[in-house]
Every structure is written in structure tokens, then in C-alpha cells.
């Protein structure tokens, strides 16, 4: 049915031929062609009640949305605009962008933080105050967070956000309102999030049905046919976060480096104690204690089970202060720092004080040592992602930075009052090369909504639970024109994943999480393909054989059709002759996968999903006695 969707897109574009390409307030900005296109379609089809902006980080989702909000009154006089956003993003980018380019809509805007404990009450209180003659336009920024907060917990408890989700899914289309969801990573943790998002945008279209069978979509064609026009899809980098990507005129080159570091004996000892503690307390599935142990260890492992919280906190504070005091008035000599900046380690001619300090710091954290050495050897500015703030996280890392003489800012929950200003200083043109501030260390608070410019190296100290979160983290530094001020030879970003290893070769928590991410991505890639093929851009570019229409009366019927995945009519089992192979998507063999090559040259993954055709002259590497094809 994509031809039918194409006809409505064409109709919307014909209705909006005179829509200006510039947005003017106290400042003027000219929209990119893709921004102008999606705005014209969404505004040109008044009965298009909802849309997902699946735009990668840095291409201007916020700007596109503000343009749409500015022109809502082109289609109706009275609007109330409700923006559901994270608290950290209200001022920047949302309020700043609105005040700069569309100040006239500020009186119509209601900002509600969906992280607020009273979110539900605040939302429905505001709904009651809206004039009945007004139409409502709801904006859900980083909608994957909103969806995640609306999922029913494993214990069956319904979360407060779910009532808002239910209200929106029932009311938006019924009352002729509009809604825009924004995300660079619309699916983060589970396939259920896809179902939730689809039913928010197209209520009732996707009932409780199994989307996958043996990790393969049951009926991709049915999904694409029924979900046409669901989203706008602007994703220039469709590669895995673990793949290298060449640079372009607008985007910096990305190179991924896996930095494996062997834990010290002290760290291994504490790591094993952390593992046992997780088993005893029943939290092994979260791996929190082991993750912290791979990052930093004190001289002893503080047991938390069956202890008074105050007593436990006091022990942690004592251990921290002891470590901090051990570094008082100590720092590396200029000679040692010069050695580190050359990318070298201390030699036999180094001072006893430098060698002793380095040894002590490495015993407690090989990861922090590796990061500090990497930062000093970097030619430009750096980012460091460390999800833990206290105990073994950022608080300790900053002590390492002090000893290594690394200037820095912090973006975390501890710096709410100063972090926006600090990032602005970090991004200043005068600091393009990191002369004033070398590094920004950030927690999960900095994973979304902020931009960094002229970054050359990102160090990821802890694996997240999903590739989407990693993509958000890396996307903070690789954005549209983020390196325009950087010298041409430095328009690159090295992404360093720092992975701890055990001396006995057993997999660590870092390697476990890496495998989890790889497993999840198999299903997510297929769902992202559905988003792509149902997007306004894909339909407009690929469906040309349609009959023009002169009204939008049939749009609601077209997008209200239920999706039927109950039949396996489109699944066929075939026996294919060929050979088993090994393949990798990385020249550095970061992940090696089993696959199958048919006699016709088609390559499949281990689950039978077609990947691509075997190249005429494939790149092959030998690793551990295996022939590895590089795709």
C-alpha cells in the first residue's frame, strides 16, 4: 500500500509549496531540505495525527519540531503545546531554540518533566486547564525514555507514566490533536518497546502478537504495508556502533578501538568477592558490583548485606578519604607527563616517585590508568563516559585526573547547577584543541540532548545494556558539522571501549555485556529496517507510480488498518547448499560470528537471515586458525 501513502505525501507537498524554508525570530535559520520536507508533510496532512522523528543525533530534530510548532496556526487558530521532556533538556535545547526562532509560541507552551515523581498529576492537571476549543500538539522528546517508563513491570505493577501513555493513544486521533515523538534510538532494551511505540502512534494497529520467530520477523511485508508514513527516517550512519565509519563533508570519521586491559591482582581479588556478594544478595543479574570492581577497587571490599546503611556509607567514605589522602601533594613530574604525552610508558630512567605513584594507581584501576594515558596522548579534546558517579566512579576518576594534570569538567547529577555553563565553555572556539579544558567526564546524565564539538577521542569505561545507549553516547561527539572548526587532519573521533580482562581467561562482566548487546541487535536491526521502509522519505523516493489525490479523506482509513501477523504465509523454509563460514564486520575483528555461504554466493547469519552477497574479492583474515571474512 506504499503507493497510496505516496499519493498523500504528494498531496501534502502540493498544499505547502509556499511554506517558507527559513525560520525567523530574534535570529534566522534556513532549514535543511529534509527538515523542510517532513514539516511540510506533517502540516500538509491535517489528519496525520502522529509522527515519529527517527533522526540520528545531531541532524536537528529539535529545530524541525520548533519549525512545525511555529506553523501550527497555518492549519488551525488555537493550539496548546505540551512538551514532555527530561528536566535537563528543558532550558537547552528546547527553550533556547524556541526563544531564538519562534518566541511567539512560548505563551502556548507547557513543559512537563516526565522524570518528575508527580508527572502524572501535573500532566492531567494541565490537560484540564486547556480551553476546549483548542487543539493540542504533544511533543515527546527522547520518546524511548517515555515508552520505557510506561512499560508494565515484571511484577505486574502499572507505572504512573502508563496512564499518560493510555490517554495519548486514545485521545490524539479521536480529538483531532497532533503528536510528534522524537528519538535517535526508538528501541533500546526490548522488542516490546517497538509494539508500545507503534500503538502510541497508530492506536490498536499492533495487537499482542509475536513479532519474531527464531529471531526473524514473522512478516516484515505486512508491517511495512500497514505502517506506511509512520515516521521520518534520517539516519546517515546505519552501521553498528562497533563499526568504523568514513568521514564526510558534514560528519567526522569514526574509528572504533577495543582496549583490553588486564586487571591487577588486587582488582581480580576484589572482583571475585564482588561476584560472590552479588550471588548472595540476588543481584547478580544486574552485575553492578562486578562492573564497579572492574573500574576501581579500594584496598578492601565493603560488604553491604545485613548492615546498617549509615555504617556502610561511613566505611565507603573512610576508604575514599584514605585513598584521597594517600595522593595528597603527589603528582607526576613534568618528565613523566611528557613521556605519557608521547604515548610511552615510564622507562628505567624514571624517578622512583613516578614509578611508585604509577604502580599504586594501576593496582587499584587499570581502566583509569589507561584512560589517563589515552587522554594525555590525544591530539585534541576528549570525552569520558563513566556511569557511576560516587564510590568507584567519577569521584575517584577526578582524583586520577588531578595527579595526571588533566584539566576537566564534569557533567553528572552532582553538577546540575553548573554543567550547562561548563559544557558551553568546553565547546568554545578558543578551546577547540583543548588548550583550556582537555576533557569532559560524563555520566548517563550526559547521554542525551547535549552536543560536544571538536572531540577527537571518546573513552567508554563501562558497557551499557544496549547498543542504543552507546549510540547516544557516541552521538554526543559525532554530529552534523561538529568538527567544522577542527583542522582537516583532525576531523575524526576515536571511540575507545575499555574492556577489563581476568588473568585466567574467563569472561568478565564487560565481555558479558558486549555479548548481550550483540544478541539484542539482531532483532533491532530488522525493526529499524521496518522504520526505514515505512518512512516518509523512503516512500517519497521509491514510490512514483500513483494517482494524485485532491483531498485527505481516506488517510485515516489507510493508517487505521490492523496488522495481522497470525499467518506464516510469508515464511518459507528452504534447504540451501553451501558451507559454514566465520565473518566479522570489523577489520580489527572485534566480534567474530558464525555464518553460512550458499553456493549462489549469498551470505546468511547463524539464524538464517540473509546478510548480503559475497564480494568478488572478499577480504579474509586469519585468526586463531580460522578464516574470517570481513564484510
Curated annotation (Swiss-Prot):
Keywords carried by this UniProt record: ATP-binding, DNA-binding, Hydrolase, Late protein, Nucleotide-binding, Transcription, Virion
Reported impact of residue 145 to A/E: Almost complete loss of ATP hydrolysis
Chain sites annotated for binding ATP: 55-62
Enzyme class: hydrolase
GO CC terms: virion component
Annotated GO MF terms: ATP binding; DNA binding; ribonucleoside triphosphate phosphatase activity
Domain of life: Viruses
E.C. numbers: 3.6.1.15
GO BP terms, alphabetized: DNA-templated transcription
Protein name: Nucleoside triphosphatase I
Biological classification of the source: Viruses, Varidnaviria, Bamfordvirae, Nucleocytoviricota, Pokkesviricetes
Amino acid at each position: 500500500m506504499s503507493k497510496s501513502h505516496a499519493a498523500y505525501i504528494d498531496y501534502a507537498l502540493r498544499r505547502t509549496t509556499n511554506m517558507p524554508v527559513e525560520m525567523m525570530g530574534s535570529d534566522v535559520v534556513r532549514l535543511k531540505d529534509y527538515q523542510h520536507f517532513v514539516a511540510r508533510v506533517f502540516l500538509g496532512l491535517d489528519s496525520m495525527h502522529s509522527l515519529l522523528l527517527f533522526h540520528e543525533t545531531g541532524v536537528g530534530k529539535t529545530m524541525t519540531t520548533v519549525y512545525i510548532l511555529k506553523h501550527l496556526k497555518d492549519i488551525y487558530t488555537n493550539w496548546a503545546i505540551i512538551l514532555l521532556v527530561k528536566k535537563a533538556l528543558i532550558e537547552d535545547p528546547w527553550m533556547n531554540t524556541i526563544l531564538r526562532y519562534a518566541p511567539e509560541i512560548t505563551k502556548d507552551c507547557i513543559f512537563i518533566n516526565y522524570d518528575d515523581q508527580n508527572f502524572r498529576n501535573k500532566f492531567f492537571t494541565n490537560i484540564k486547564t486547556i480551553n476546549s476549543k483548542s487543539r493540542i500538539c504533544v511533543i515527546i522528546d527522547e520518546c524511548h525514555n517515555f515508552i520505557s517508563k510506561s512499560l508494565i513491570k515484571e511484577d505486574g505493577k502499572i507505572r504512573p507514566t502508563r496512564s499518560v501513555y493510555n490517554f495519548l493513544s486514545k485521545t490524539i486521533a479521536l480529538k483531532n490533536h497532533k503528536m510528534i515523538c522524537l528519538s535517535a534510538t526508538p528501541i533500546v532494551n526490548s522488542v516490546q518497546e517497538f509494539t508500545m511505540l507503534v500503538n502510541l502512534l497508530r492506536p490498536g494497529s499492533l495487537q499482542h502478537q509475536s513479532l519474531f520467530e527464531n529471531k526473524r520477523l514473522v512478516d516484515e511485508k505486512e508491517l511495512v504495508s500497514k505502517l506506511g508514513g509512520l515516521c521520518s527516517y534520517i539516519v546517515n550512519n546505519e552501521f553498528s556502533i562497533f563499526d568504523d565509519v568514513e568521514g564526510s563533508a558534514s560528519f567526522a570519521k569514526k574509528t572504533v578501538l577495543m582496549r583490553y586491559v588486564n586487571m591487577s591482582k588486587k582488582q581480580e581479588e576484589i572482583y571475585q568477592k564482588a561476584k560472590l556478594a552479588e550471588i548472595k544478595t540476588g543481584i547478580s543479574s544486574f552485575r553492578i558490583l562486578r562492573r564497579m570492581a572492574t573500574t576501581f577497587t579500594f584496598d578492601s571490599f565493603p560488604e553491604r548485606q545485613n548492615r546498617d546503611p549509615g555504617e556502610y556509607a561511613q566505611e565507603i567514605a573512610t576508604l575514599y578519604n584514605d585513598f584521597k589522602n594517600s595522593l595528597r601533594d603527589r603528582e607526576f613530574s613534568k618528565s613523566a607527563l611528557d613521556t605519557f604525552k608521547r604515548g610511552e610508558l615510564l622507562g628505567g630512567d624514571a624517578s622512583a616517585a613516578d614509578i611508585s605513584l604509577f604502580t599504586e594507581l594501576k593496582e587499584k584501576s587499570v581502566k583509569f590508568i589507561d584512560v589517563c594515558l589515552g587522554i594525555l596522548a590525544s591530539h585534541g579534546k576528549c570525552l569520558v563516559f563513566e556511569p557511576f558517579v560516587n564510590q568507584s566512579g567519577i569521584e575517584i576518576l577526578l582524583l586520577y585526573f588531578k595527579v595526571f594534570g588533566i584539566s576537566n569538567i564534569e557533567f553528572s547529577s552532582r553538577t546540575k547547577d553548573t554543567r550547562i555553563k561548563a559544557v558551553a565553555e568546553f565547546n568554545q572556539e578558543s578551546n577547540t584543541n583543548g588548550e583550556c579544558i582537555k576533557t569532559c567526564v560524563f555520566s548517563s546524565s550526559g547521554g542525551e540532548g547535549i552536543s560536544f564539538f571538536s572531540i577527537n577521542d571518546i573513552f567508554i569505561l563501562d558497557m551499557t545494556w544496549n547498543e542504543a545507549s552507546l549510540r547516544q553516547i557516541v552521538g554526543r561527539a559525532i554530529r552534523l558539522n561538529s568538527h567544522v572548526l577542527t583542522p582537516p587532519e583532525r576531523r575524526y573521533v576515536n571511540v575507545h571501549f575499555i574492556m577489563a580482562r581476568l588473568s585466567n581467561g574467563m569472561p568478565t562482566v564487560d565481555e558479558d555485556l558486549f555479548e548481550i548487546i550483540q544478541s539484542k541487535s539482531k532483532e533491532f536491526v530488522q525493526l529499524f529496517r521496518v522504520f526505514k521502509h515505512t518512512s516518509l522519505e523512503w516512500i517519497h523516493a521509491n514510490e512514483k507510480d500513483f494517482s494524485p489525490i485532491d483531498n485527505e479523506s481516506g488517510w485515516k482509513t489507510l493508517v487505521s488498518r490492523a496488522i495481522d501477523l497470525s499467518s506464516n504465509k510469508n515464511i518459507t523454509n528452504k534447504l540451501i547448499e553451501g558451507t559454514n563460514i566465520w565473518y566479522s564486520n570489523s577489520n580489527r575483528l572485534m566480534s567474530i560470528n558464525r555464518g553460512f555461504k550458499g553456493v549462489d554466493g549469498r551470505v546468511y547469519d547463524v539464524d538464517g537471515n540473509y546478510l548480503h552477497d559475497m564480494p568478488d574479492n572478499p577480504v579474509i583474515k586469519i585468526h586463531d586458525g580460522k578464516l574470517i571474512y570481513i564484510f
